[in-house]
Curated annotation (Swiss-Prot):
<keyword id="KW-1048">Host nucleus</keyword>
<feature type="compositionally biased region" description="Low complexity">
    <location>
        <begin position="275"/>
        <end position="304"/>
    </location>
</feature>
<keyword id="KW-0945">Host-virus interaction</keyword>
<protein>
    <recommendedName>
        <fullName>Apoptosis inhibitor UL38</fullName>
    </recommendedName>
</protein>
<comment type="function">
    <text>Plays a role in the inhibition of host apoptosis to facilitate efficient viral replication. Promotes stabilization and inactivation of host TP53 through interaction with host MDM2. Induces host mTORC1 activation by antagonizing the ability of host TSC1/2 to negatively regulate mTORC1. Thus, inhibits a growth regulatory pathway to facilitate viral replication. Prevents premature cell host cell death by blocking host ubiquitin-specific protease 24/USP24-mediated autophagic ferritin degradation in lysosomes thus maintaining lysosome integrity and cellular viability.</text>
</comment>
<keyword id="KW-1119">Modulation of host cell apoptosis by virus</keyword>
<keyword id="KW-1035">Host cytoplasm</keyword>
<dbReference type="GO" id="GO:0030430">
    <property type="term" value="C:host cell cytoplasm"/>
</dbReference>
<feature type="region of interest" description="Disordered">
    <location>
        <begin position="247"/>
        <end position="305"/>
    </location>
</feature>
<comment type="similarity">
    <text>Belongs to the beta-herpesvirinae UL38 protein family.</text>
</comment>
<dbReference type="Pfam" id="PF02393">
    <property type="entry name" value="US22"/>
</dbReference>
<dbReference type="GO" id="GO:0052150">
    <property type="term" value="P:symbiont-mediated perturbation of host apoptosis"/>
</dbReference>
<dbReference type="GO" id="GO:0042025">
    <property type="term" value="C:host cell nucleus"/>
</dbReference>
<comment type="subunit">
    <text>Interacts with host MDM2; this interaction leads to the stabilization of host TP53. Interacts with host TSC2; this interaction prevents host cell stress responses.</text>
</comment>
<dbReference type="InterPro" id="IPR003360">
    <property type="entry name" value="US22-like"/>
</dbReference>
Amino acid sequence: MTTTTHSTAAIMSLLDEAEWRQTQMDVGGLIQASALGKVALRYAVRKLMKRGARLRHDSGLYVCICDPSYEFLQMNLSKISWLERHCPPLDQELIMFGVIEAWEEASVRPTRQLVLFMTPKWDVFAYDSGILFFLAPSMAQFWHGAIVLEYWNALFPVEVRSHVRQHAHTMDDLVMVFHQLDYEKQVLEARRDKNTEGPRTFAKSVNSYVRAILESERRIREGKIPMTFVDRDSLRANSLAHIQATGAQPSHAPAQRVLSAPPSLPLPVSEEDPAAAATPSSSAATTPPSSVVPASVESELSSSPPLPPVVVKDVVYTAGEGDVVQMVVVV
């Protein structure tokens, strides 16, 4: 009986090792094909799809390699082309190479599905619930990186940006977020290795990046796909409805000036630099006299009743004192 048990364990170990080697070869083939171009990548994906390949990610998730002809795909080609046009700063073609799925017992279709794309410039994205998430700047880094679906690496469609402020405005911003997440992931792994070999070490603090990585790992250990927006505070703080409900933004936050007034209009003196307001600039000294409002006209304007608000789509512009215009977003 003992001999049979040892033989079974040895066979299972050999099978696991063979599966691991085959996975590494398939992942290497995908990485090489992605470097050669989109035609080579599509050919490699179709070849693996015919084999029914399911490759294991370093996080523990299994990626089903497939193209848009996949039987259980929950989006069509028109949706993919729509994402290519409505999710700036993305301005490239999306090449599908796999999905990460969650199945319930006896379900006809997947209960949740992450669709994986790569662009001709090697950027890897995941699509979930109408939003694109930047995962890695290359195919090789994707297979060893963290699967995090947060506000910082999200690309919201332009139709949604009237309700939420985008964090990343360029692809460089997304790459910077990836490197920050990768750094925190390496620190966590090094701390775990040190804890197993020597005295126990503790983290100085747990920031939002670490919290998102730990929550993603916990969900994967439970056999689930990482959830979106673990850090709800960042998403809520950049919701335009929340900003309007909490009132005006503080004057010491220059990054939030766009939310208090349109960029084409002058800002109030209280929101500008106090030193600049106290010291007259050269441009102000050279202002022609015709641009100065006479005192009689100014008193006439101040005594006149306020103008009614003008509604333009979902933005209300209300005339205030002087030339200052306040923007109110209606959600």
